[in-house]
Amino acid sequence: GISSGGLGWFPDGILEHFDLVYFDQRGLGLSGELACPKAYAKDFSNYLNYDDSVGEEGYDTPAEQQDAIDEARTFVDSCVSEIGIDPARLVYYGTNQVAEDIESFRQLVGDDKFWLYGVSYGTSVAQIYAAAHADHLAGLILDGTIDLTLNGEEGALAQEKAFDEVLVATLKACDADESCAAELGGNALAAYDSLASKLAEKPIAYEYPLASGKKVKKKFTFSQLEFTASYQMYALGGRMLFLRALASANEGDMVPMARLLYQQATVDPAADEYLGDSTFSDTMFYSVNCTDDSYFSGTQEERIAQTIEAGQASNGTVPRLDGSVYTGLYCAYWPSAPKEFVTREPLTAAGV
């Protein structure tokens, strides 16, 4: 992923057969970190605490759409200013450049061929390197492969559907387990939909217990449920904890779900302060995402209009987890975003 944490994943036994070379890609950690924590914290807080009290969930009214556009513009302007970088230089922080940086490292190390291992976003880096420098690869190991033939809009919708499918499978697996089914009335899908429906109507008020022993009044929003559900789907343990939290929420106790939210969002529940994740760069997520693909083609105004239209068209096509396509609003303002679609042919790397 777009992160600085990775070496800890590998067992020591691998070193008996391979040398491991790991690096912070440019814009991360020790490689000239780009960061706008203040701008991101404000934007992220707006998202988590967003209360859509008009119409359906999503930006379905002109006022909501304009607010979303304004927030995207404000974030990008504030973020670039906080980074303190010449906006023209952001073009050098995309995945194509990361692949070329790897080639520079290979030349410095002096190996003619090497194995390239990528997980999630790392599979994009690996594929782009393979397309450009297949003659220097002994092989690729890809986990959670990203389809680079999809444009930004298609990729966002595919990701939404994948998360939704895992969520539905998790809920159905609960029904097939006697003890889990007993906790959620034998229909975990209905329990989730009921909670989502209540939150879509209005946030649920609850009291959150702090480490000090005090309790603070909080409100759990629909956006918080979508965020928590999505991030808990990444691993088996996370899915198990989500089912337990859903069972508690089904009984009127939102605290276990809130604990998962604060953990995944890296937010201090006492101060409602965004703490950030030292192994993941929120800033570089936008920089790489928007440098690699514009989501839509045309002028800035045309790309914004197409993003809103696509968001409305996708509303309801992914029943439980949607909204990723609205990242296109941020990319419409990001200085290094291309003006046209970025299209790639399926990867062919003979001999790899």
List where the protein language model places each region.
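Alpha/beta-hydrolase active-site loop signature
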Residues: R26-G29, V80-I83, G122, I146-D147
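Alpha/beta-hydrolase active-site loop
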Residues: D43-L108
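Loop/turn elements at helix/coil->beta-strand transitions in domains of secreted/extracellular proteins
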Residues: E16-V21, R26, Q65-Q66, R73-F75, ...
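Alpha/beta-hydrolase fold nucleophile elbow
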Residues: L90-V91, V109-Y121
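A catalytic-pocket lid/entrance helix-loop region that shapes and gates access to the active site
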Residues: A35-S53, I128-S194, Y231-Q232, L243-A270
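Glycine-rich nucleophile elbow surrounding the catalytic serine of serine-hydrolase chemistry
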Residues: A99-E100, G118-A130
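Alpha/beta-hydrolase fold active-site neighborhood
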Residues: A190-A350
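N-terminal cap/lid subdomain of alpha/beta-hydrolase-fold enzymes
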Residues: G1-Q65
